[in-house]
Each structure stands twice: as C-alpha cells, then as structure tokens.
C-alpha cells in the first residue's frame, strides 16, 4: 500500500472520498468562492442571488429576476403596500452550499429552505433597488448590508430547489393503500 497525496481518491462502497490536506483547504474554498460568485467589482441592484446581512442574520434573495425591475418608487406606492422581495436564510455551516468571504476568511454557508423571509422594498427612478454605500434600503428604512452575489446559474439552482421543496404534494392516504401501490 502506497502513501496517498491530497489528490488521491479512495473508493469506499459506492462513493469516493477526497483526502484533502489542510494546506490545500483554503485554496479549495477560494476556488469554490470565485467559481460561484460574481466579481466583487460589480455592485448589483438587489436581485436573485444577492446575499445580504440584516442584524446578525444572512439572507439570500430568491426573487425571480423579472420581478426585480419596474419596482415602484416610495411616493408611487399606494395603500402602504410596497413591492416585496423573497429571501431564504443562510447560515454558517460545515455542510455548505457556497462560501462567502469575510475579512479574508472563507465561511461555508448553508441554505435553510424552511426559513422564508419577505422584505418590503421600493425602487429608484429606474425601477430597481440600487446598492448605495454597500447597503440596500428597505421600505421601512432598514438597511441590508451587501455581502456578495451568486452567479445566475448558482442562484437559479437554489431558487429551483426552494420551489421544488414548497411544491410537494402531501395527501392523507391510507397506509395500506400507499404500501400496496408500491408492489
């Protein structure tokens, strides 16, 4: 049996495990981060894939792209009924969906599909929610701190997983019939 380096694979049952040395872990986190995030030079309007922070909580915007434009300005909102954006919570976790960068450290984040938040917004004269001084301003004047933005396909994958999760059909079926139907 020979020694294995960090790129070696070991077959165990029906899956493969990577052996990763600690010295390579930060490189992998960095590669994952830069593969899934848009450039930090781009400061996007609030849209699908934007990761924001409110108080000590992180959120991922899953509002469909087509619903992130033509947002009424604050003085155009009638009956105190502003446009609303949909977010899911993301939390620091060892089982991560993506990484965010904070103070030159990469933090693994996991989407919590069961924690949905709706936030009221208003648009500017161009009908979008712009980024100003690294913050998005909500209808109630709360400020969302901009953290990063996922590339469109990564964000769409998460939005699709969210939609699949909430669109499951649950019925109250007799157990004997449910089991009989599988035979």
Describe the residue ranges of each PLM region:
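Extended alpha-helical coiled-coil/bundle linker/stalk regions that scaffold oligomerization
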Residues: 2-112
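C-terminal terminal-subdomain/extension
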Residues: 92-183
